[in-house]
C-alpha cells in the first residue's frame, strides 16, 4: 500500500509540497514580468494541475488566469482564451466579481486581437458593468475595459460610441496618472489629417 501522500503516479500531492499556491503564483508572475514566458507557463501548468487535484477552485481560477497570461505572452491566443474561459466559469460560481471582470476583459482583449469584435463586445460590457459597481478602486481596470470596448466600436464603424468611450477612458487614465493611456486616448481622439 502506498503512503497517503503519494499518488499512484509516484508524485507527491500538493499538500505535501512546501510551496504554497500564492508563492507559486508569485514565481509565475515574476517569471512573466522578467520575460521568462516558458517558465511562467510551466509554473502555472503545475499550479493548475495541483489546484485541480486539491479541488481548490479559487486557486484553480487564479492559476488558469496566470496560464492564460503566459499563453497570450507566448502568442498562443487560442489556448489563452480557453484558460480565461475556464477561469470565468469558476469566478461566476465563486466570485469575487472583480476577478470575474478581470478575466472577462482579458478574454475580450484576445477576441478583439483575433478580429472577433462581436464576440468581444458582450464580455467588455459585462466587465464594464462590474467595474462600475466597484467604484474608485476599479478605475484603472474600468479605463482599460473602456479602451478595449472603444477599439471594438472603432473596428465596427461606430465612431461616435468609440469617441465617447475613449473620452471616458482618457479621464480615468488621467485620474490614475497613467500617461501612456492618456496619450493613446488623445491620439485616438485627435482629428485625422
Language-model segments: which ranges?
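Structural signature of alpha-solenoid helical repeat junctions
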Residues: 19, 59, 79, 99, ...
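Short coil/turn linkers that connect adjacent helices within long alpha-helical scaffolds
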Residues: 12-15, 34, 52-56, 90-96, ...
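Eukaryotic all-alpha helical interaction scaffolds
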Residues: 44, 51, 91, 131-133, ...
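Residue register of alpha-helical TPR repeats
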Residues: 22, 62, 102-103, 140-144, ...
Amino acid at each position: 500500500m502506498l503512503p497517503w501522500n503519494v499518488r499512484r503516479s509516484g508524485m507527491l500531492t500538493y499538500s505535501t509540497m512546501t510551496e504554497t499556491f500564492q508563492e507559486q503564483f508569485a514565481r509565475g508572475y515574476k517569471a512573466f514580468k522578467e520575460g521568462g514566458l516558458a517558465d511562467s507557463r510551466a509554473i502555472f501548468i503545475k499550479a493548475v494541475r495541483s489546484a485541480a487535484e486539491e479541488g481548490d477552485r479559487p486557486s484553480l481560477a487564479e492559476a488558469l488566469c496566470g496560464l492564460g497570461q503566459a499563453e497570450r505572452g507566448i502568442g498562443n491566443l487560442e489556448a489563452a482564451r480557453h484558460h480565461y474561459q475556464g477561469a470565468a466559469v469558476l469566478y461566476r460560481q465563486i466570485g469575487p466579481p472583480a476577478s470575474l471582470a478581470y478575466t472577462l476583459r482579458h478574454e475580450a482583449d484576445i477576441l478583439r486581437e483575433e478580429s472577433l469584435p462581436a464576440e468581444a463586445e458582450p464580455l467588455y460590457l459585462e466587465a464594464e458593468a462590474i467595474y462600475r459597481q466597484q467604484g474608485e478602486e476599479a478605475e484603472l481596470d474600468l479605463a482599460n475595459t473602456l479602451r478595449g470596448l472603444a477599439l471594438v466600436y472603432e473596428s465596427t464603424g461606430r465612431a461616435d460610441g468609440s469617441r465617447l468611450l475613449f473620452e471616458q477612458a482618457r479621464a480615468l487614465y488621467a485620474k490614475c496618472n497613467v500617461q501612456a493611456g492618456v496619450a493613446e486616448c488623445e491620439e485616438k481622439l485627435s482629428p485625422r489629417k
